[in-house]
């Protein structure tokens, strides 16, 4: 559950990591870029069967994450398309690869872009970039005394993991963000825009996240809510998950 969004102010000294405004002058192209802290709670899941089913392992763990929104300055010029990107974390820093590849079309068509931090291994680099701006980000592990599984250790999956944080918080973050963007709550940062379709995208490791979300979460009744949490999915360079 997302409890609150808080816009992060931009100054000459403090601005978003990999800011498109700074490097592409989005404001001169009729777009605005805003960054938000996203506060909430999320469940942590574990595998329930060999077909990708999951069940809750730990409920309601608190987190502080961040999103970045790029949208037309003029709400009337919005296409109604909202593209949510699972920002790629593979290099231990944030790379919004699908934005990099598609921004010209997004801006030309009037699409809204929303990028979400997808893995806490990137927080250290963001804090190094601007500690005051990003120091409050937290994906704290709600069960730090539980060791990593033997399977994870054997398969070599510990390279960018540690007991201080919990990567599994992401799935509920993504679901709750999608429904927030669809709704008309006051805290929805794009509530003034037309929103007809909400899409999910990601590149490489983030594409694999997309596959996992689609296979294990998107069609769970509490996620789909009798409809579709996302209207479409586009993975770039992903592998099966």
Which sequence ranges carry the predicted segments?
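Catalytic-loop region of hydrolases
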Residues: 1-100
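Gly/Ser-rich "nucleophile elbow"/oxyanion-hole loop immediately N-terminal to the catalytic nucleophile
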Residues: 73, 77-78, 153-204, 224
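Cap/lid segment of the alpha/beta-hydrolase catalytic domain
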Residues: 113-178
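Phosphate/oxyanion-binding active-site loops and adjacent basic polyanion-contact surfaces
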Residues: 31, 59-65, 94-95, 159-179, ...
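Short amphipathic alpha-helix adjacent to the substrate-entry channel of hydrolases
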Residues: 96-114
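Primarily recognizes the serine-hydrolase "nucleophile elbow" in alpha/beta-hydrolase
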Residues: 196-241
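Short, solvent-exposed loop/turn and secondary-structure capping segments
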Residues: 48-54, 78-79, 93-98, 116-118, ...
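Structural recognition of the beta-strand scaffold that forms the well-ordered cores
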Residues: 36-38, 81-85, 112-117, 199-202, ...
